[in-house]
């Protein structure tokens, strides 16, 4: 019930394939010996990517491999002649300068561009298995991609599952590299105000090699210091959860003037930056 299988035909056009998501594609033979292409999306927020197998802990299978294995049960009444996992990589280049109209709000303009990016033309097709040339040609025709842009890989098409695997195996410390902790900068003295220290002389932090704590402490001190009336900063790339933003918001709530220049075009972090700029 959580999957939406599609059989491409006259009544059902080729579906839109989202950028970077995994699909199971299958070649189906009808009773009349005609071939059809069937597609099942493997990405679903309701399904976990890694499925633990019975018979003992530590054995897992990716949901897309499970779907591909049993795909014949989904398309009952058809003969499976070939199958593979498929991933489409779409163009991510957006020319903001060429399309921008000075009469538009730039933030709203960038939001529209982010929506357009999701629908840009495919530039690459990744397959997990070899497929008949006629099928590959059909996929290329549907997606408007040349055959030299089709690649086959025995490795998983999306390795982001490693982060989930990391959480599952957290107790097995022997499987992990020793954690690298940012070093405590020798530039700063303990027990003294960061603002006072940078007033006396310039300081340099190189993140992630140096700990960012002195910088965050400086912002917190500035937010709480009555002598600070204004904070001005330039931010290029912001995370979904940002302690820098938390400190700046605290400063604004304490009556400080907070002016931040945010780069809305930080590649692949545009959505975070747009959200925080509000």
Regions found by a protein language model. Give the residues of each.
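N-terminal localization/anchoring segments of enzymes in phospholipid and broader phosphate metabolism
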Residues: 1-278
